[in-house]
């Protein structure tokens, strides 16, 4: 999870400027989520305050995520969906998002929901759209004209072709297709969106361990005793593992096997 999408500030609702707070970059692993929640120290009945402080490359989502009823786990899931997009797919997502916003506006004030955003993020990895290298109507019009998308231009001479109103052609095509420009790309949706699977509001179950070690004695000490130790471990668990192996010195042990949860 190297690519981070959001930076969030977590605290107790009602007293956000409290010493019990956490800052977290999303997407985060289950361990990171639970570690942040333990820093906030919510008591029974208390609610979580969450503020998105950094949108990285997705600042245009701020007006729509601000005030949206969304939990930490749901926001983390959205961040995970966005984090796997490459540069072109990110542009496609922004284009699909702009189209969806306009569709909602035309539908008399419909709001962008969390499910809308998740569907768009998933769809940005499908073939429901086309992306053309064009930063404005003139470049778009020339692309369509040069690639025979305008039948009326068939057979025109080079001299006449260069005199065409490419900006007008591009504008006409863009308006008829409801496409949008994103930076230096033109995004056109030409298929159905994919529905993202449901996501729960609550955090996943707290992982029981980060590392699971199978330990044995060094060959020099003989014996075939083994024990399993989950890390992080309490002092009691560490002492119990040593007792099982029959040694008080970790230098006398070897790791026979290592497994870990996804972090």
Locate predicted features:
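N-terminal ordered "arm"
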Residues: 1-47, 207-247
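An N-terminal, globular interaction/scaffold subdomain
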Residues: 34-82
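N-terminal low-complexity, intrinsically disordered segments
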Residues: 48, 252-259
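Metal-dependent nuclease catalytic core centered on acidic motifs
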Residues: 79-138
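Conserved small/polar residues in nucleotide/adenosyl-binding loops
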Residues: 261-263
């Amino acid at each position: 999870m190297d690519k981070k999408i959001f930076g969030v500030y977590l605290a107790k609702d009602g007293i956000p400027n409290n010493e019990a707070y956490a800052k977290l970059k999303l997407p985060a692993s289950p361990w990171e989520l639970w570690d942040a929640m333990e820093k906030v120290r919510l008591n029974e009945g208390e609610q979580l305050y969450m503020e998105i402080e950094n949108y990285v490359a997705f600042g245009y989502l701020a007006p729509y995520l601000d005030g949206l009823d969304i939990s930490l786990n749901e926001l983390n899931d959205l961040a995970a969906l966005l984090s796997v997009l490459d540069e072109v797919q990110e542009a496609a997502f922004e284009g699909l998002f702009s189209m969806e916003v306009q569709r909602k506006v035309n539908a008399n004030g419909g709001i962008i929901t969390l499910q809308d955003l998740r569907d768009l993020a998933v769809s940005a990895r499908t073939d429901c759209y086309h992306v053309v290298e064009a930063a404005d109507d003139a470049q778009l019009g020339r692309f369509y004209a040069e690639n025979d998308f305008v039948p009326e231009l068939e057979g025109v001479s080079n001299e006449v072709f260069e005199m065409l109103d490419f900006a007008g052609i591009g504008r006409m095509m863009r308006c008829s297709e409801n496409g949008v420009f994103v930076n230096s790309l033109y995004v056109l949706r030409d298929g159905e969106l994919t529905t993202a699977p449901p996501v729960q509001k609550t955090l996943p179950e707290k992982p029981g361990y980060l590392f699971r070690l199978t330990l044995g004695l060094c060959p020099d000490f003989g014996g075939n005793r083994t024990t399993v130790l989950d890390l992080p471990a309490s002092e009691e668990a560490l002492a119990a593992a040593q007792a099982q192996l029959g040694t008080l010195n970790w230098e006398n042990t070897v790791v026979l096997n290592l497994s870990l949860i996804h972090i």
